[in-house]
């Protein structure tokens, strides 16, 4: 299945919110009008049905984490089979993806760039090279930039950006060594309040 490689701004405009698909050099709002949907009639956002609202929420989360539809459905099915709230389980599984953890630690300026670092074998987990972006990181795992990639300019710049915006509390990073520990799976209260995972559960429960 093909991965979307078009304008990132267009996706954020589609969802009407900043999906953090571009680096933090400049705020997305200064680069594109996220209040207007893409296309020639973008100024008009029609009233959505319940299904449309649920679908948009699913698409928003899928695009934030850079996951294709088939894979996203697989995450949902796995989340539904676990104990606890399905929506919370889903978000936690997405947060534990290696490409997302690399982004959270600040080694990549975006999740897309972080996924590329993983795919290009620039990242190790517990001393072993892992090139699978969907790899599930566990509490206590040590995620590091491999020696061959330590001096990559984009990693240095990403760490500088991360230092400016701040790091999440569930990772502990030594920026000088470009290595960090995934301390724990984040609780729902630690994650974005702008996501309504219950809409996704309602969508897939039909």
Swiss-Prot record:
TM annotation in the entry: none
Domain of life: Bacteria
Keyword presence, Ribonucleoprotein: yes
Subunit structure: Part of the 30S ribosomal subunit. Contacts protein S5. The interaction surface between S4 and S5 is involved in control of translational fidelity.
Function: One of the primary rRNA binding proteins, it binds directly to 16S rRNA where it nucleates assembly of the body of the 30S subunit.
Keywords on record: Ribonucleoprotein, Ribosomal protein, RNA-binding, rRNA-binding
UniProt GO MF annotations: rRNA binding; structural constituent of ribosome
Keyword RNA-binding among record annotations: yes
Protein's name in the database: Small ribosomal subunit protein uS4
UniProt-listed SMART domains: Ribosomal_S4, S4
Residue span(s) of domain S4 RNA-binding: 96-156
